[in-house]
């Protein structure tokens, strides 16, 4: 198969496609509060000062529908990270790694507006397609020793909760029910089943109509998907 990272970035760097992904995964209350029709892709370089090891794959921000207390538009920052994991278990330190993506977002916001007194919300979404599903920690607190025995510590220890989109756990009906247009729908299907050609062939009938729409409406993307499958 082709480069999973290239597939992910090509498709989901398009804000309209990323918005469909976010509508599928974010809590409904947050989706209702965000104006995802105005989702904006930010430049990773300007956020992370060219530190590749601290850059999420894609960084977006979306305005809240209601104005802030000062009458200004508030934004929520939404890093999307594709975690391609070929081992049988997810990395045990993903929440800590995610914190390294979040901190530069805050630093960038303060650099952009040195007068601001608050930090923007950041919601970290990890798109995972490991072979056996996500079994790793979903929060920093799960990694910190002693919190169960001494709960009073929880209020004083930093936490970060990940949103995990485990595409390997999606069946055909669940995936097809997502609010995705044909191109991103096909991309998620390929990410899910691309490990095994037998799986792609077995699930092809379920996605036949979607693929026909891609060929008709987005022939360049159809060719890209074909090359992805061929390599």
Language-model regions, residue ranges each:
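Elongated, amphipathic alpha-helical interaction scaffolds
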Residues: 1-231
């Amino acid at each position: 198969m082709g480069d999973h990272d290239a597939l992910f970035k090509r498709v989901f760097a398009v804000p309209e496609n990323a918005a469909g992904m976010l509508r599928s995964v974010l809590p409904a209350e947050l989706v209702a509060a965000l104006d995802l029709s105005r989702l904006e892709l930010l430049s990773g370089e300007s956020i992370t000062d060219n530190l590749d090891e601290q850059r999420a794959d894609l960084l977006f921000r979306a305005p809240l529908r209601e104005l802030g207390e000062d009458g200004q538009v508030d934004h929520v920052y939404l890093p999307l990270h594709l975690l391609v994991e070929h081992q049988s278990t997810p990395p045990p330190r993903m929440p800590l790694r995610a914190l390294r993506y979040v901190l530069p977002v805050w630093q960038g916001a303060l650099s952009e507006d040195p007068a601001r007194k608050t930090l923007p919300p950041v919601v970290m979404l990890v798109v995972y397609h490991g072979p056996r599903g996500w079994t790793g920690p979903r929060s920093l607190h799960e990694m910190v020793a002693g919190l169960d025995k001494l709960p009073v510590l929880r209020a004083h220890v930093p936490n970060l909760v990940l949103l995990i989109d485990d595409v390997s756990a999606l069946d055909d009906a669940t995936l097809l029910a997502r609010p995705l247009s044909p191109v991103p729908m096909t991309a998620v299907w390929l990410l899910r089943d691309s490990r095994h050609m037998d799986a792609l062939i077995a699930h092809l009938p379920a996605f036949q109509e979607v693929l026909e729409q891609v060929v008709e409406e987005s022939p360049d993307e159809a060719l890209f998907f074909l090359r992805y499958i061929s390599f």
